[in-house]
């Protein structure tokens, strides 16, 4: 009876004030669609997935996609929360997965830079290019948060977190809020005491240049040159662009990217030079097997590939050591013997470079 009585509420025009609106009146589920345009407040236990979907003419797939915490069996529906009942239909898509394979033997040559993962939970409307977050705790106020993350302003904080009102009401404990976007100055990067520039026995010691923006954990503490990752960047493309360091060096300076380079994040800064790193391409050898004088050698060849090779293959997008060896019916051990620089886990396979697939 509850379902049938609820379903006729819109016809009778007796929906209670404040039950639904453009903004939620209660907490939302973690992962709620950030593009949600209308919310329903679950004010009592009469609500079920079935009657909500019927009332708002929703498919179960859409309702669960917009409110992941509800769960497919509807066991997550709880009184006191607000659920999304209207959002752009194009947003009902599966979470994209990385092109890089989870298998160490099948890692692709060039995972591209991707956006950093979004913490959860967040309120709706959060800016999509946020690079720094703060989890609100009991007692937090906008003033306290702004003071902690100077030099951001109240206007910026509310612009990045539009679910907050101008008087900062709507700040929810346990939720994440944006406190930085690309280009936002970061006080911790410039707050190093001047005395550290002359500490120790080295009178010529200097403070290392601070990264001009967000960085990942573990970055080399003696980094002197930086690169901001943009769409389409891969580890291989950075090596080709600068030509002053090896893949092993880049991963050593930026360990968070991972050996398969799948952790390269858009708009983050990466170390591309430490003391002693050449500053021009001409300062280091080109990444080809220049020691070989074999006539008809293709170019460019995989660094370290054997000279006595009878057959070459140019690496294409999406190929892996495993797929190449299957195609040419050779063993993975023999392939790595002919192309030692691809590495143990094959992360050194370079896009559009030639690899040896047949020894003499």
UniProtKB/Swiss-Prot annotation:
SMART domains: LysM. It is found in: Secreted; Secreted, Cell wall. Induction: Expression is induced during growth on Sabouraud medium containing glucose as carbon source, but not on keratin powder, nor on human nail fragments. Residues 1-21 form the signal peptide. Residues 94-125 are annotated as: Disordered. Keywords: Cell wall, Chitin-binding, Glycoprotein, Repeat, Secreted, Signal, Virulence. Its main location: secreted. Residues 37-85, 132-179, 225-272, 311-357 form the LysM domain. GO terms for cellular component: extracellular region. GO terms for molecular function: chitin binding. Coiled coil: none annotated. Residues 94-113 have a biased composition (Low complexity). Glycans are attached at residues 129, 204. Secreted effector that binds two substrates, chitin and N-linked oligosaccharides associated with human skin glycoproteins. Could provide the pathogen with three important functions including shielding host cell wall chitin from the human immune system, shielding the pathogen's glycoproteins from host degradation and immune surveillance, and helping facilitate pathogen adhesion to human skin. The LysM (lysin motif) domains are small globular domains involved in binding chitin in eukaryotes. LysM2 contains 4 LysM domains. Belongs to the secreted LysM effector family. This is Secreted LysM effector LysM2. The lineage of its organism: Eukaryota, Fungi, Dikarya, Ascomycota, Pezizomycotina.
């Amino acid at each position: 009876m509850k379902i049938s009585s609820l379903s006729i509420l819109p016809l009778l025009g007796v929906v209670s004030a404040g039950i639904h609106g453009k903004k939620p009146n209660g907490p939302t589920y973690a992962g709620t669609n950030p593009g949600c345009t209308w919310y329903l407040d679950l004010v009592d236990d009469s609500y079920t997935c079935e009657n909500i979907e019927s009332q708002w003419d929703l498919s179960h797939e859409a309702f669960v996609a917009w409110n992941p915490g509800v769960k497919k069996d509807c066991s997550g529906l709880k009184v006191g929360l607000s659920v999304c009942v209207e959002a752009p239909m194009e947003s009902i898509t599966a979470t994209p997965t990385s092109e890089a394979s989870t298998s160490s033997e099948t890692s692709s040559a060039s995972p591209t830079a991707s956006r950093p993962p979004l913490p959860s939970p967040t309120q709706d409307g959060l800016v999509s290019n946020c690079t720094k977050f703060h989890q609100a705790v009991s007692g937090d106020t906008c003033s306290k948060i702004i003071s902690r993350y100077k030099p951001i302003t109240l206007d910026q904080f509310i612009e990045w977190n539009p679910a907050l009102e101008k008087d900062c009401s709507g700040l929810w404990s346990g939720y994440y809020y944006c406190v930085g976007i690309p280009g936002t100055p970061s006080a911790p990067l410039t707050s190093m005491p001047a005395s550290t520039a002359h500490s120790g026995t080295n009178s010529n010691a200097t403070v290392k240049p601070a990264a001009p923006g967000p960085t990942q954990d573990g970055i080399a503490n003696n980094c002197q040159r930086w690169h901001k990752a943009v769409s389409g960047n891969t580890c291989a493309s950075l090596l080709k662009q600068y030509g002053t360091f090896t893949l092993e060096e880049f991963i050593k300076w930026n360990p968070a990217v991972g050996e398969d380079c799948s952790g390269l994040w858009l708009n983050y800064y990466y170390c591309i030079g430490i003391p002693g790193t050449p500053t021009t391409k001409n300062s280091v050898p080109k990444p080809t097997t220049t020691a070989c004088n074999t006539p008809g050698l293709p170019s460019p060849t995989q660094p370290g590939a054997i000279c006595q090779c009878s057959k070459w293959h140019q690496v294409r997008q999406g190929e892996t050591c495993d797929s190449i060896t299957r195609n040419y019916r050779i063993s993975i051990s023999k392939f790595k013997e002919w192309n030692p620089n691809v590495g143990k886990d094959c992360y050194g396979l370079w896009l559009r470079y030639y690899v040896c697939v047949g020894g003499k």
